[in-house]
Amino acid sequence: VRSRVISAFAAEEEKRVLSLKPVLAPHHGRYGDHPHQVYDAWPAEDPDAPLVILLHGGYWRYDRMHLTPFAAYLAGQGLSTVLPGFRRSGGAGGYPKTFEDVARLVDTLPGGRPYILAGHCSGGHLALWCAARGLLPPGSPWHTSTLPTGVLALAPLTDLAATRRDGLSDDAALQLMGGEEGFDAHMTSVDPLTLLSGAGTTGVPTVLLHGEVDEEVPLTQFSDYAAVHHDLRTVVLPGTGHYTLIEPGAPAAREVADTLWRMAREQRGPGTTAGPTDRRATASGTGLT
């Protein structure tokens, strides 16, 4: 296990964001029978508002509660937001259960409803993996031709081999994959960079957004993926770390919300309008009910 040394800037940012009080969602639901197969929903007032499925980070280990303030913030910007739980490393999850849950979640969405799959850190890895499921062999249980209508990956882990090599977050990639033997046997089916190699694109409109001074996820994870994805859009935010991307009201978080709205307008045409709202809505705006 490698010791973790971060700057005072990164330590203060992490403490500030992760100490935010969790926000209770107005709606909750299930997509399976396991206790972790649940979701929280913050519908926007407009039932036709863009739908964002938000996958939390935490190097596949931690739960979704730290992301509830950001989910509520996105809803306040007029984006219907769903924050799911899933089985995680170190407990009920890891390979293959974490991937089974995320695939099951997105596969339960009503056909034809556009949605943007967004994820932070390891949630970004899972979002990019979902975009690449069409590149899996047809015999894979996770292969599908029904893909997200857009993906926004925030400070994502794109390369599991590099994550293992660098020992990120106390060898989190090895824990996810069940150790060295499991890693080598199964990585090719769940690693976004590996799946993308040779294809050059997933066919899903994708944006990568990373903080220039992120000390949790190296910028090389961003640049190495961008180097092989032919039609990717990339944004590097100067002076921005890992956690301010999900800090409600921070300039980086506003950039995330603006990016989601731009993606939604591109999906739905120039008539789509943006506008923040803090008023409550019915559960129908989540797309999962």
Per-range role (PLM):
Residues 2-46:
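N-terminal cap/lid segment of alpha/beta-hydrolase-fold proteins
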Residues 107-166:
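Primarily recognizes the serine-hydrolase "nucleophile elbow" in alpha/beta-hydrolase
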Residues 240-251:
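Catalytic histidine-centered segment of alpha/beta-hydrolase-like enzymes
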Residues 215-221:
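Conserved alpha/beta-hydrolase "acid-adjacent" motif
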